[in-house]
Structures are given as structure tokens and as C-alpha cells.
Swiss-Prot record:
It comes from the Eukaryota. It is found in: Cytoplasm; Endosome membrane; Nucleus; Late endosome membrane. Its main location: cytoplasm. Required for degradation of both endocytosed EGF and EGFR, but not for the EGFR ligand-mediated internalization. Component of the endosomal sorting complex required for transport II (ESCRT-II), which is required for multivesicular body (MVB) formation and sorting of endosomal cargo proteins into MVBs, and plays a role in autophagy. The MVB pathway mediates delivery of transmembrane proteins into the lumen of the lysosome for degradation. The ESCRT-II complex is probably involved in the recruitment of the ESCRT-III complex. This is Vacuolar-sorting protein SNF8. GO terms for cellular component: cytoplasm; cytosol; endosome membrane; ESCRT II complex; late endosome membrane; membrane; nucleoplasm; nucleus. Transmembrane segments: none annotated. Belongs to the SNF8 family. The gene is Snf8. The modification Omega-N-methylarginine is found at residue 4. Residues 27-53 form a coiled coil.
Amino acid sequence: MHRRGVGAGAIAKKKLAEAKYKERGTVLAEDQLAQMSKQLDMFKTNLEEFASKHKQEIRKNPEFRVQFQDMCATIGVDPLASGKGFWSEMLGVGDFYYELGVQIIEVCLALKHRNGGLITLEELHQQVLKGRGKFAQDVSQDDLIRAIKKLKALGTGFGIIPVGGTYLIQSVPAELNMDHTVVLQLAEKNGYVTVSEIKASLKWETERARQVLEHLLKEGLAWLDLQAPGEAHYWLPALFTDLYSQEISAEEAKEVFP
């Protein structure tokens, strides 16, 4: 049986229908976008009212501050943005994180000769709290991380390295690649690492392990102990817990503030 070809009229009708569907889809998308924008504006207004009402608690309570920061992040608001915008004027968070950043730099500089420019987040938190005094605004580890990220954005050499269940804060512009990072993670348990331990745990060749350790020594991030039993131990002072309890001495403070 002979099939009839599709006529010009049918083609035109089909194109017209497609155009109408496309137009309708565009209208629906625009309506949906307008509705989402309206909801976002309403959420932002409610967030501003919430911040105004609870600003004292946001300033004083670290846990409350974290929750507020997370609420802001859901709509792309950055309360830490510099400048004299609504958030910095209302909450004073711009000044808070600027001052915290300065204090972080002071602590890292004072302890650099001990740890080579690497410090655990826990020790940094401990030293910052000691420096602030008991009447100062409380600070959480989350606050420290946010302040460090701001410092990192300024190109100051600061970085955050995940190690086990915590972080190492890097305050010197040393080049650390993935090999260096995994060795730091391996040393987290005992505070030191050996060539044999690296080879056994990471399945590396001897030369690769030695290159990484030599780099850490060169950058001042590791100490070499040739008197250790068995073979040389490479200590990571940032992970050497006996140093944590030592407060910043007057001499160390003078190195930062001559």
C-alpha cells in the first residue's frame, strides 16, 4: 500500500505547535524564576530580621555563630565579606574575623621556630584562647578556620591540611604536594615517621620516601633524630604533643613584637 507523503501544511502545523510549546516553556521558566527570586528575597529579609534580633548571641556564642553562617551560606550571603555592608555594620563580624586573623598570625609567628610553620588546629585554638583572656569574646575552631580561609585568600602563605580527624595549619609559603600531605597524615599517630614506615604503609620506593622527608627537613617542618633506635626518626614538631602545653614565652612574644 502506497504511503502518502507529509504535506507542507502538516509540517507548518507541527512547527507552529513546537513554537507554542517552546513559548509556553519559556513563560513557565520565567514565572518559576520570578517566584524563586521572590522567595529568596523574603528569606534574605527574614535572615536580616533574625540577625538584628539575635546579634548579641551571634557575636558571643560560637555554636550559634556557626549555625548562622550555615544559614547565610544557603542563600549565598557572606557575612565575612569586607567593606561596610549591612552584615559588617550590624554584626561587627568583619572586625571580629579581622582581629582574629591578626591574632592567628601573631601566634603562628611566635611559634614558628618551634614547629617550622605547621601547627595543629587544636594547639592554635588553645594558644589563641590564652592570648584573648577570659573576658574576651569566645572563639571556636570553626571561627579559626573561617579566619584562616580569609588569610589564605590574601595570599599570605596560610593553608589548611586535613590530618586524621583534625587539621594542620600551614603559616609559611612552603610548597607541599600530595606526597608531603600523606606523610604528614602518617606521622599524626606518633608525631614522627621513618623511611621504613613510609615504605610499608604507602608502598613507596626508598628514594621517593627520602625525597619527601628531605623536603620537610629543608623547609624546617621536620626534625631529624639520628640517635633513635633502629633507624632515623623524622619528627614533626607540629604533631609533637609535648610542645602543646607550653605557653608562648616572653622571649617568643618579643620576636613578634620587638
